[in-house]
Design a protein with these regions (language model features):
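Extracellular glycan-recognition regions
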Residues: 299-547, 573-592, 598-601, 619-810
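Beta-rich carbohydrate-recognition and catalytic domains
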Residues: 33-194, 201-206, 210-251, 266-271, ...
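Extracellular beta-strand-rich recognition modules
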Residues: 275, 371, 551-555, 602-608, ...
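Short, surface-exposed beta-strand/strand-loop-strand elements in extracellular ectodomains
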Residues: 563-572
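Bacterial N-terminal signal peptides that target proteins for export
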Residues: 5-19
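Bacterial N-terminal signal peptides
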Residues: 18-26
């Protein structure tokens, strides 16, 4: 079928522009597509510093990163591309700011405002006329806890946010250096201390990102909430997605993720999120810098992380910093007097009525552009600003700042006739001699105009784009960083490889077949898109796979009748004829296990073999090739299978005794990929009754500053099946508690009960006392698809015995062999016969044209090989 891909040539055009600029000595060199970053990010001069609570701002095209550093000085680093960072720069030695917590900076009208909480003892505001300082304290202690953050809304009103024991608070700032009366924002994690707030606005929606609960716990994590009413209106936490960043399991020694900031990257369109992780080396706890992308599906935000492997470099929009002596061939000036000053900015020094400088590379018909300008010192009037949709000297459009009247003015020149089309007031104490920015977002015929990051208007323009540049009328003006990009409204994410493991929204396919349709899906605060596919339709994604492994997928979909799909990695079928049962029109998740993916960059395609299905998203997680069985009878001691232990657990009289609160999780990190299994145990409660099994457990953690098992009792992502005084209960824990099913039954202390949970796909069956019929059965519409197993007590001391956790397997009836190599294991198969490998549970892994080639592909594990004639052999690869 023909392929539909609206963005096929965009990135190639960007690289072409950049190669031309490198030859013409413009500011930004070409960046290779695969020269990216790997978390944690190590910046020059960082090694001796703690990098916590990072915040990034952009000023005149340069990114400035500020952070808590546990030093006597406040520091920042600078970068143009988010890859290459400067040495650490001391931005303040003010004695009041020693050990400043979470310094955050906002630029406004020529002044940089920093808010920080020295030693966590209340907030001070510092100011500077430079992003690199020196910042000086200009207020007394304004208090308001820690982790202060400032947001400026489109009307110019400033808002202040901060941490609190009962959740994030916000208030309207009377001035730039004072705080107002707090409002609770309904953003509290587990009813506990919540910190690290940050607010930004996108397409009329307010997004609040926040962190909890304690910086020194592995389960330090990030949630987000949304509202459409205002910066300090009541926010709605996005419970279905939260937490959006967590790594309590500590894969790659990466845990304790929290407190960061969102910002737009150098392609002018893609969002990024910088945050910190925790590491412990040589007995020292240190925070490190991490960076991941944010993807947008309509109004829905998705964090593409956390990642610990090399990611694609940020795409850099064609741009100019004027850091050279001559203007160069990429600029055309048709009036005025233009020159570069101090290799820093472009100056227009005449009083010409219509002085223009045109940036030769053309914008797309759909584009984002950024411009930086100021009125020259000593000037008080005139108009200056951005030139766009430039076709020739008689056909163009302008977005101008009127210095004398503090207005934004939009002009159109058509066939030599120039017309003022709209005027908008600029907010606040507008100072024309300070650096200001104009941002244009043009999508088809819709144009959004921002001044200093604030939306001034959304208007309708023609479909055609054109060149961009700078213009002044009857005044001298200076111009700085300019950039243009073919991306707008989140489209830039389609030209990078999406990280796997991770989440793939169906609508973020790079390519799609003809006939595959996008449909709007209503959210409580906006819309996103889903993909409707019928027979032979397909979607294809560019992905970046962490390593060659088996992976599990949770495919979220709906279908009125059964359908079948296949998955391809590159050109190879990795799953064929996968059944998607009918869902009756409701959303459900179909687990697809044991998908073998190569490491690095490849494509993933999903094809509909038959049926009619609507796809929402795909969650891909690490699998395991060799699911193990774990058992412990606690006869003389607790065995070494228990790898995550909270509180003090002891072997007592042939049983394992729990603390009053705590979790004990079996298995190693490789077992997190286990999907379908049973877990069972004898449980005796000795005081109070609230204990049982946990399964498909991910990211278990304690809570609070002192490894508090009470605070951490719900700190896991997984399921619980247990007993209480008067009921059996099945619950879902996602750093909180949701009851899924329960049944009344009386239970008594000092009496043993046998609990067993069998989880297969999205269905959980719970058994009591070896009864043949499950006492509870539940199918989760949004399940955890894999994870470890263990036990848990809650306000109850319990005794556990005869623990067993075993994968669900389908016996092949084939005798196993363990050979010395591929040739040995392949012996007995026709060398010309195609052979397919399956897991012991019957899932197809991959196929090849003969057994020797196939065996060379397989990871360590146990497989069943079958050829086209039905010959079969169980093989062990070690």
């Amino acid at each position: 079928m023909p392929r539909i891909n609206k963005n096929d040539n965009k990135i190639m055009r960007i690289f072409k522009f950049m190669a031309v600029w490198a030859l013409s000595l413009l500011a930004v060199p070409a960046v290779a597509y695969n020269e990216g970053w790997k978390n944690p990010v190590v910046m020059s001069g960082q090694q001796s510093y703690d990098v916590g609570d990072p915040q990034v701002i952009k000023y005149r095209g340069v990114y400035y990163l500020y952070c808590s550093s546990a030093t006597k000085s406040l520091l920042c680093w600078t970068s143009r591309d988010l890859i290459n960072w400067s040495d650490a720069i001391v931005v303040s030695n003010d004695p009041i700011a020693v050990d400043g917590y979470a310094p955050e900076v906002r630029y406004w009208n020529g002044t940089f405002y920093m808010v920080t909480s020295p030693n966590g003892l209340g907030h001070y505001v510092l100011t500077s006329d430079s992003p690199t300082g020196p910042f000086k304290v200009v207020t007394e202690n304004l208090y308001q806890e820690i982790d202060g953050s400032i947001f400026i809304d489109d009307d110019g009103q400033w808002y202040f946010y901060h941490a609190h024991h009962t959740g994030i608070k916000g208030n309207k700032m009377p001035t730039h250096t004072s705080f107002g009366t707090d409002v609770d924002l309904n953003a509290c994690m587990n009813g506990q201390w919540t910190e690290g707030p940050g607010v930004f606005k996108r397409n009329g929606k307010y997004y609040l990102i926040y962190t909890g609960n304690h910086v020194l716990t592995n389960g330090y994590r990030i949630d987000y909430a949304v509202n459409t009413q205002g910066p300090i209106a009541r926010y709605t936490p996005q419970a279905e997605q939260n937490p959006i960043l967590i790594s309590a399991d500590g894969v790659d020694s990466h845990y304790g993720l929290g407190h960061g900031s969102a910002f737009v990257g150098p392609d002018l369109d893609s969002y990024y999120f910088c945050y910190h992780n925790m590491t412990r080396t040589s007995g020292r706890t240190q925070r490190q810098l991490d960076l991941d992308r944010i993807a947008w599906n309509g109004d829905k935000m998705m964090m593409l992380g956390n990642t610990t492997w090399m990611q694609d470099a940020p795409i850099i929009a064609p741009c100019d910093y004027f850091d050279r002596a001559e203007i160069g061939p990429d600029w055309s000036t048709n009036s005025g007097t233009w020159s570069i000053v101090n290799s820093d900015y472009l100056a227009q020094t005449s009083m010409a009525e219509n002085a223009m400088a045109v940036f030769t590379p053309h914008a797309e018909d759909t584009f984002t552009a950024e411009f930086t300008m100021r009125l020259a010192q000593g000037e008080t009037s005139g108009r200056f600003g951005a030139l766009y949709a430039y076709a020739d000297a008689n056909n163009y459009q302008e977005a101008l700042l009127n210095a004398a009247e503090a207005k934004l003015e939009l002009y159109t020149c058509s066939q030599g006739v120039r017309t003022l089309t709209a005027t908008y007031n600029l907010v606040g104490d507008f100072t024309p001699q300070a650096w200001h920015s104009i941002r244009l977002e043009k999508k088809d015929t819709r144009l959004k105009v921002f001044v200093d990051g604030l939306l001034r208007t959304t208007t309708t323009v023609g479909e055609k784009g054109g060149s961009v540049g700078y213009v002044s009328h009857s005044c001298k003006a200076d111009f700085s960083y300019i950039a243009l990009s073919p991306y707008v409204d989140g489209s830039g994410i389609l030209d990078v490889n999406l990280p796997v493991p991770g989440i793939l929204p169906a609508a973020l396919c790079k390519e799609q077949s003809a006939g595959a349709e996008r449909e709007n899906f209503a959210l409580s605060y906006g819309t996103c898109e889903v993909m409707h596919l019928k027979q032979n339709h397909w979607l294809q994604y560019n992905i970046n796979v962490r390593m060659k492994l088996l992976y599990n997928m949770g495919l979220r979909y709906k279908s009125s009748a059964a359908a079948h799909v296949r998955l391809l990695a590159g050109d190879e079928v990795v799953k064929d004829n996968v059944l998607l049962p009918a869902t009756g029109g409701a959303w459900a998740v179909a687990p697809i296990n044991d998908i073998q993916l190569p490491n690095g960059r490849t494509t993933l395609r999903i094809e509909v073999i038959d049926g009619d299905v609507t796809l929402y998203e795909m969650l891909i997680k690490r699998g395991t090739a060799t699911p193990k069985t774990y058992e412990d009878t606690f006869d003389t001691s607790i065995s070494k299978i228990w790898k995550h232990t909270e509180g003090i657990w002891k072997a007592v009289d042939g049983k394992m005794r729990s603390p009053l609160y705590g979790k004990n999780v079996a298995g190693t990190l490789t077992d997190i990929g286990m999907t379908d299994y049973s877990v069972e145990c004898d449980v005796t409660c000795t005081n109070g009754i609230n204990a049982g099994l946990i399964f498909r457990t991910n990211n278990p953690s304690i809570g609070g500053a002192n490894d508090d098992t009470t605070l951490g009792t719900d700190f896991q992502q997984g399921y619980f099946f247990g007993i209480s005084n008067n009921a059996v209960v099945l619950g879902k824990q996602n750093y909180g508690w949701t009851t899924l099913a329960s049944k009344n039954r009386a239970f008594y202390v000092n009496q043993s009960y046998h609990l067993k949970a069998v989880v297969e796909g999205a269905t959980i069956k719970c058994y009591l006392n070896d009864e043949a019929t499950p006492i509870l059965t539940y199918t989760d519409p949004l399940p955890f698809i894999s994870g470890r197993a263990g036990v848990r007590s809650h306000n109850c001391i319990a005794l556990f015995d005869n623990f067993k956790w075993a994968p669900i397997t389908v016996s092949s009836g084939i005798e196993g062999v363990c050979g010395n190599g591929a040739a040995d294991l392949a012996d007995g198969f026709d060398s010309q016969s195609p052979v397919t490998a399956y897991t012991l549970s019957g899932q197809k892994v991959c196929a090849d044209r003969n057994a020797t080639l196939l065996l060379n592909k397989l990871l360590k594990g146990i497989y069943v090989l079958k050829d086209k004639n039905g010959k079969a052999k169980k093989v062990i690869i070690n």
